[in-house]
Regions:
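Sec-dependent bacterial lipoprotein signal peptides
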Residues: 1-18
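Bacterial Sec-dependent N-terminal signal peptides
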Residues: 15-50
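Ser/Thr/Asn(+Pro)-rich, low-complexity disordered segments
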Residues: 37-430
Length: 430
């Protein structure tokens, strides 16, 4: 493979423009707060009416998309203009992956007329300016950072002050999207693009092999490499693609992709689950839905090919398997149905908490990630829209920025929080 820079494929920045180009702009300093969770009769958690005209459906998608963009644009960290981890979290801790998805959404907002091109370019530059001063670890940024100083913050016991290669790859993908979109000779756009080129030339992907034929997820300046190799299939595909296409000094060789991405349980020839071809990975029913959603914000699975997989089929069947399990195999007390499914990473009622949910007794506790099924709209649009319409009409899930993170029907629990890593990808996939 050549080490030429990858031209990222933005799937959806300009695909849904018909309904909102004449909408009134919002500007964060003046935008009034949307009322918080409304008061509704006890027990009225779920949608009663699902009658939708095409116009109402279009408006529903627009409202969801715009509300989630407002979460980033109005609720960013004040100094860095990067995305916060989420609501009810530190107002100074920024999330690298959340910021990557937010950067990807900026061109969408410009095309939809929610912000001007000038405002979008300025936010792009503000984020780049912060990233340029932020602490780096052989070119990679930290999973979480102090938005005031740029210092890397602890994420887990193995990542106290560490570069996170996967989330760095996400951030670069988002910046590449902005670079492709903000391509004029305007001074702001030119300066921002120069930062992105600089970052591209500084990330030492080869260092993160640790001398092996694989990539490692993270490296801590005091603790060394975290014991976590990046093997597919998972959300980390962009890390391998950018490592292959990096400048020669820092690029990895093709055998790192072949041996690292494939891993030991990558290909299972002939395997089917519920009648769907599902030959990739060690999980017969698939992991959390985000693992086949987030990387394909930037990589078109219909076009991307390697020697091992049909990634469009893989993404589509992952969604169909998740839905089939929920409707047919999950415990009946979880009350899943065609309007209530979508197992992915999300908050949960205490003591269940946040975790990556997926089909199977050990990974499913009845908690539905609202953006799980939403994120399947490119591959299973009819099934996704069934869920989206229901969520939109569920009062207890509505908050300042629209549909909140998660709910559990069997426990009559509905969350009121938002996570940047959950909501920001939806802006682009819609």
């Amino acid at each position: 493979m050549s080490h030429q820079p990858i031209l990222c494929l933005l799937l959806t920045a300009v695909t849904v423009l018909s309904s909102c180009l004449d909408e009134q702009d919002f500007h964060s300093p003046e935008q009034p707060e949307t009322p918080s969770v409304p008061t509704v009769p006890e027990g009225n958690y779920f949608a009663d009416s699902l009658e939708y005209t095409p116009e109402k459906q279009r408006q529903t998608l627009t409202d969801i998309q715009r509300g989630y963009f407002r979460f980033f644009y109005e609720n960013c960290q004040a100094d860095s203009k990067m995305a916060l981890i989420g609501t009810e979290r530190s107002i100074n801790t920024v999330a690298l992956a959340g910021s990557a998805y937010a950067a990807t959404a900026i061109p969408v907002a410009v095309e939809r007329g929610w912000i001007t091109r000038k405002e979008g370019a300025q936010r792009f530059l503000d984020m780049c300016t912060f990233l340029n001063k932020a602490e780096r670890y052989h070119g990679a940024w930290s999973h979480w950072m102090d938005g005031k100083t740029g210092t890397g913050l602890p994420f887990n016991q193995k990542q106290q002050s560490a570069g996170d290669l996967v989330e760095t790859s996400f951030m670069m993908m988002g910046l590449f999207i902005c670079s492709e979109y903000f391509n004029s000779e305007d001074a702001t756009e030119t300066e921002a693009r120069a930062f992105v080129s600089k970052f591209h030339n500084e990330i030492d992907w080869n260092f993160y092999t640790n001398g092996e034929k694989t990539l490692y997820w993270a490296w801590d300046k005091d603790l060394g490499f975290a014991p976590l190799k990046i093997t597919g299939p998972c959300e980390a595909l962009p890390a391998y693609l950018l490592a292959l296409s990096a400048p020669e000094e820092y690029a990895v060789t093709e055998d790192v992709y072949t041996n690292g991405w494939r891993g030991n349980k990558f290909f299972n020839a002939g395997r089917t689950t519920y009648g769907y071809t599902f030959e990739l990975g060690g999980e017969e029913k698939g992991g959390p839905l985000f693992t086949t959603q987030h990387p394909f914000l930037w990589i078109n699975p219909f076009l991307y090919q390697d020697n091992y997989a049909d990634y469009w089929e893989f993404c589509t069947n992952h969604a169909l398997i998740n839905r089939h399990y929920s409707l047919n195999d999950a415990p009946k007390e979880y009350l899943y149905d065609e309007y209530n499914w979508g197992l992915s990473a999300c908050y949960g009622p205490e003591p269940l908490g946040y975790k990556g949910r997926a089909p199977g007794e050990s990974r499913d506790d009845g908690t539905i990630c609202t953006t799980g099924a939403m994120g399947t709209i490119p591959v299973t649009p009819f099934y996704a829209l069934q869920v989206i319409r229901s969520l939109y009409e569920t009062p207890h899930l509505q908050g300042t920025y629209g549909i909140a993170d998660a709910y559990n029907r069997s426990l009559a629990w509905a969350d009121s929080r938002y996570l940047s890593i959950s909501v920001m990808p939806v802006v682009s996939v819609i």
